[in-house]
Amino acid sequence: MSASSDSAKLAGLNKLIISYPQSKLVGDAYGAQFSVLMSLHRDSAAFFAAHNYLAAKDSQSLPGALHNVAMELAFRRQYPDSALILVDSAISLYREKHGRLAPVLLHTRAMSLFLLKRFAEAELTQREAITLLPASAIFDPRYSNYFAQLGMIQLETHPGVEGLEQYVHASFISSQPSVEYANLDSLFHSRVKDSTSVVRVRDSLFERTANEYLHNFTDTSRAKSFIAESFSRNRVFTGRALQFAREAYREAAMRSLQERCDAAASLGIVLSNAGHNGEAEKFLVEALQTALPSATELFLALGSVQESLGKKNEAFTTYLAGVVVSRPSVLMKPLQALQKELYPHASIDSMITVALRRWVDFFPEKYQRPDSLDGQPNQKTVLAELFTGSECRPCQAADIAYNKLLERYDRAELAVLEYHLHIPRPDPMANTDTELRSEYYGVNSTPTSIIDGTNVINSGGLGIAARAKFAVYADAVDHSLTTPAKASVKISAKILRSKVSFVVSASVTNARKSYKLRVVLAEDGIRYQGANGISEHRFVVRKMIRGAGGTSFNQNGKVTVKDAFAVSTIEDQLENYLTTYEEKMQKPGTLFKEKKSEIDPKQLYIVAFVQDDATHRILESTIVKVKR
């Protein structure tokens, strides 16, 4: 950050403190002020801000605040004695409150001890911090700095290569090495007496770490991609890096789109590091299908490759896509340089705003049945089920993506059902059957998407991630559409004077006891806006007719479900469920801002599907609009 931007930030913080002295934010404003003042080397003013920051904290938040100040001092390598006093106070308060230690507190303490040249004590403290990390931390990039710091300390306490082993380990697992261990060659030359042995010793340590990593993961394809990127980034075994990356890409060919794109990104990055820019571009572009704006390394690699190939406009678009949420300097710098050359009179902020809209407002292509499937009997209708919640912010991307699926596919190709759940807070479109259906699949988080009963796709995101989620969902649907239907389902449904009547008949060959026909009443286009900002909800499950358990087939592999009911009956059931739920939560009449029990008869659909309860596989599904 530049001195001018630091000064501007400082002015803004001062204004907040002066204008709103009673605000709860004032304490944190002093904390931010402390950090900025330290970067400006205004130490006296910084310590005054730190004092006010700590004074504003209650007993609950004081340990964290003490640690924040200590960490700022220690990792700026300033005032280590003060840092040690502060972090020791934080440790004492934290242990008193929680009865245990936190690894991050010990990590900061070890750094303070190191700066005070109390190396033996620093090593013991850092080792203790590492023992408190999760078991998976040894190969988790988020914890690489713990191993790097141990290596830094050991270089002072051990004459051999023990410290180098920790540096290599940290450099291997980290996606973005810190300054502490970026230049390994100079460290090896300072420790290995025989200069001719430097490369051999360095490579042997990397190879050993890679072998340990490979043996710790059952998914060898993903492991190979990780190792390939690490070797390439650290400039060791470049030939083997390319070999591993290509193998991982081939092995991912039959996996999900997300896995294929991850492998393509790794291969593209390795190729670009090796100077094979033409080939690298192909794989990096492929990886964009599921990329989020936070994929800085991918956008940087692709933009750099495109610039090297003389494709400046494409490079500009690539860099622009990577700065729509945050503005990482590694992307902003080349973006601004290209903007001055290509669009000198345009506003970079306006261009970023337009680029941001493209992440959410995209237009999917209509599905085209592959020629290879022509003549295939029993074309299938895929069922996509989404477990979501109107109060679930991470469900935003999944909800938008499902709406885009409905644009891509006709209802003869895809049926959609959305089950609303009380996650993380009460949802007025939830009901008994949506809860039972979530129990059937073992769903305990939202969003969860399930394609044809067996392809479970978890994780969500805000609207900015909708395009990537859509690509993953559409790939799964496309794949399911290549398999023929294993059952026949026919529906006739009508509504007369607010009474729905329907007949569903289904047949299968080689019927099993585990085969069930399930019939669902869904309502399209419910208007309601919860915390996730989605205002229209598509194909919401209102009732599973004959229960969530479904209906069994007879010995001849046939089943018919015939029923009639008043819409008001379903509305009463939904209203009673919501009222009972409020009472259960001891908030009668106040839990929901609006009870969405009223049904629009013009927007009703019957969805029926045959499912194998032994495997959850859906053999066929059908959707029809209830005719008036």
Region annotations inferred by a language model:
Residues 3, 40, 76-77, 116, ...:
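Structural motif corresponding to the intra-repeat A-B loop/turn of tetratricopeptide repeats
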Residues 37, 73-74, 113, 154, ...:
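Residue at a conserved register position within TPR or TPR-like alpha-solenoid repeats
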Residues 16-28, 56-62, 77, 93-101, ...:
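Short solvent-exposed coil/turn linkers within tandem alpha-helical repeat scaffolds
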Residues 6, 43-44, 80, 119, ...:
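TPR-repeat structural position
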Residues 419-628:
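Short, conserved sequence motifs used for protein processing/export or organelle targeting and
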Residues 33, 69, 109, 143, ...:
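Structural register within alpha-helical repeat arrays
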Residues 374-414, 419:
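Local sequence-structure signature of Cys/Sec-based thiol-disulfide redox active-site neighborhoods
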